[in-house]
A protein has these predicted regions:
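Outer-membrane beta-barrel proteins
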Residues: 1-171
Length: 171
């Protein structure tokens, strides 16, 4: 839905698991999977701002994995949530800057035992990125820095940091 400078959107999907529950093994006995996304975007002149929220439950009945072991999207038990925001500003026709922050949360599905209650199954993967681009005639210079805390939903992994500068010339 778009009106003037504001845009909203939603998406939802649920897939029914049609496995016969009486003959299914514990490994194949999965729930229905579901995913949802909602977003909003506002732009006015040189400024644009956007936010989104998403949810994914792949329907896996496996027990949660501890926060220090890493997770794989769509194969881990539990569910994933994401909150993201971005802001971009065109300083002039030649220069633009933007910032993005994303927080992905893995919420484990632990077994209901005393030992499981003492284990942390939740972990946030946080991404912060800043970008800048400048162009003049046939030349462009682009740079960004991105930092990812707890990559691959693993609380023991070191924070990743990437910085890149690119220069382009057109002849």
């Amino acid at each position: 839905i778009k009106y003037d400078a504001v845009q909203f959107g939603v998406y939802g999907n649920e897939v029914e698991n049609t496995t016969d529950k009486l003959t299914a093994t514990a490994a194949s006995n999965e729930r229905d999977s579901s995913e949802y996304v909602a977003y909003a975007k506002y732009s006015m002149g040189p400024l644009a701002f956007g936010v989104s929220r998403s949810y994914l439950d792949a329907g896996k009945n496996t027990a949660g994995t501890a926060a220090n072991l890493g997770q794989t999207l769509r194969t881990a038990g539990g569910y994933f949530e994401n909150d993201q925001m971005s802001v971009a500003y065109n300083v002039n026709d030649a220069l633009s800057v933007s910032y993005t922050r994303s927080v992905d949360t893995y919420n484990g599905a632990p077994a209901r035992t005393v030992a499981a209650a003492m284990t942390d199954y939740n972990v946030d993967t946080t991404t912060n990125a800043i970008q800048a681009a400048y162009s003049m005639g046939a030349m462009s210079i682009k740079a960004y820095n991105m930092q990812v805390k707890n990559p691959q939903y693993d609380s023991d992994k070191e924070t990743l940091s990437v910085t890149e500068i690119a220069v382009g010339l057109a002849f």
